[in-house]
Amino acid sequence: MAGAKEIRSKIASVQNTQKITKAMEMVAASKMRKSQDRMAASRPYAETMRKVIGHLAHGNLEYKHPYLEDRDVKRVGYLVVSTDRGLCGGLNINLFKKLLAEMKTWTDKSVQCDLAMIGSKGVSFFNSVGGNVVAQVTGMGDNPSLSELIGPVKVMLQAYDEGRLDKLYIVSNKFINTMSQVPTISQLLPLPASDDDDLKHKSWDYLYEPDPKALLDTLLRRYVESQVYQGVVENLASEQAARMVAMKAATDNGGSLIKELQLVYNKARQASITQELTEIVSGAAAV
């Protein structure tokens, strides 16, 4: 059994670590609330854009934009949103596993996959497993802006415009609540039709000013940008929630470990006292 001094040192070490994890839990909780506010502020715009685009997909358009037309699939692209930092449980790896499973279904059909990464964890993971990373952006911090995301989005849209991509998806974690974050893969292009049953039984038509091409070119790019930005802010809220839960679990585990070490320390101290008493009694008997 380890000596009492060594056990006391271990207890002190765990207590110091526990203070750090508790502080990180509190910081993550504060950042999560701010991330939720940003997510709530941008969500109505993203959802409204999705509805408008859903209407367009069902509409009888006088100008058929390339983003509305299905193609034979030879290559697909994924905009993958991950975190820049770790210590957030299985948030990233669960997302990567889901993406790898989907990519396998494409490669089994001889379809190639391109990846545009947002977040350093995704970059390092897919570089290590041999993914075809064609664009990346990292280090956006806790308050990302759309201008920082334009690079990877522009690369993938250009590839789609030039016919080098036939489908485009966004991969991110959807924030449900503090305890639940769901990895999701959503199709961006070609434009997915709305799931609203009312729209499926209506024939939509529009009048465009100044002209359909100019309006749709701008609107559809804004749609893609809005969905990517919403994916990033939801993933950020998911990251802070997962980190808060992970740090709370670490703090609780530290408390359990301290109790176990305290019990071992008490036993070691009791054994030491018993040994000293035995030696005293033995010495007295010898005299």
UniProtKB/Swiss-Prot annotation:
GO MF entries: ATP binding; proton-transporting ATP synthase activity, rotational mechanism
UniProt organism field: Shigella sonnei (strain Ss046)
Location relative to the cell: Cell inner membrane
Protein keywords: ATP synthesis, Cell inner membrane, Cell membrane, CF(1), Hydrogen ion transport, Ion transport, Membrane, Transport
Domain of life: Bacteria
GO BP: any one term: proton motive force-driven plasma membrane ATP synthesis
Subunit structure: F-type ATPases have 2 components, CF(1) - the catalytic core - and CF(0) - the membrane proton channel. CF(1) has five subunits: alpha(3), beta(3), gamma(1), delta(1), epsilon(1). CF(0) has three main subunits: a, b and c.
Alphabetical list of PROSITE patterns matching this protein: ATPASE_GAMMA (PS00153)
Protein name per its UniProtKB record: ATP synthase gamma chain
